[in-house]
C-alpha cells in the first residue's frame, strides 16, 4: 500500500524541478521587481502546484513498477498468479471498474494500487504478503486496494496536493516580497537577500504544514478503503484479521529505503502527523464499530 508515498516522493521531485526551472527563467526576479502582481503570482502558483501534482499522477504507474520491480502477471499461467488475477477481476467487477493490471513484486508484506485513472489502474502484491497471510486475508488486502481505485483516491489526493502546493508557492513568495521590500526596504531591481532567504525558509516550513494536511486526508481515505474491502468481501472479519497480522510484523524488517512506505509502520509522537496510514489499532477499531 505504497501508492501515496510514491506519489508524494514523485510530486516533491517534480516540484523541485519546476521551481529550479522557474528561477532559471527569471520568474522569481520578475515578481519581485514588478511590485508583485498577486493575481499573476496566484496563477503562477497554481501552474506550479497543480502542474507538479498532475505530472506526478501521470507518472505514478510506471514509477511504481520501476521502483518496486513489479512484474505484471495478467497473462501468467501460474496457478497462484491466476488466483490473484481472478480475485482482482472479481472485486473490480463488484466495484464497477475496469480490470486493472495485476503485478507481483519481491518484498516484505505489502501491496499498493496506483494509476492516473480508475479504469487503467495497477494493483500490486508483494511475495511477502502471499507468504505470510491466508487466502482470505490476501483477498481482504486486494479488496482494500481495489476500493482505493474505485474511490478515485489517487485523483482526490492529487487535487489536495495541488491545492497545498499552490498554498505553499503563493504564500512563501508573497511573504518573501513583503519582508524584502517593506521590512528590509530593498529598493533595488530584482529580489534581495530577504526575499530569497524568506522564500526558501517558508517553502520548507509551509511544506511541512502542507504535508501534515495531505497526510490527514490520506488517513481518512485508508479508513474508507478498509470499509470498502469489508463490503467487497461481504464481511469485516478478513480485513480485521489481515490488519491484525500486519500489526504483528516488525517494521524494522523493511529495508531503510522503503521503510517509510510500508503499511505496517508505527509512527509515534510528532511523526504520526506525517503518516499516510492510521495506526493499525485504530483501523481495526473502526471496522469493529462499523455497521
From Swiss-Prot:
Compartments where located: Cell inner membrane
Transmembrane helix found in the keyword field: yes
Cofactor note: Binds 1 zinc ion per subunit.
Cofactor field: Zn(2+)
Main location: membrane
Transmembrane stretches, start-end: 4-24, 38-58, 159-179, 197-217
Residues that coordinate or bind Zn(2+): 144, 148, 222
UniProt xrefs under CDD domains: M48B_HtpX_like
GO MF annotation list: metalloendopeptidase activity; zinc ion binding
InterPro entries registered for this protein in UniProt: HtpX_protease, Pept_M48_protease_HtpX, Peptidase_M48
EC code: 3.4.24.-
Bilayer disposition of the protein: Multi-pass membrane protein
UniProt GO BP: proteolysis
Top-level lineage group: Bacteria
UniProt similarity note: Belongs to the peptidase M48B family.
NCBIfam families: PRK05457.1
Name of this protein: Protease HtpX homolog
Organism in which the protein naturally occurs: Leptothrix cholodnii (strain ATCC 51168 / LMG 8142 / SP-6)
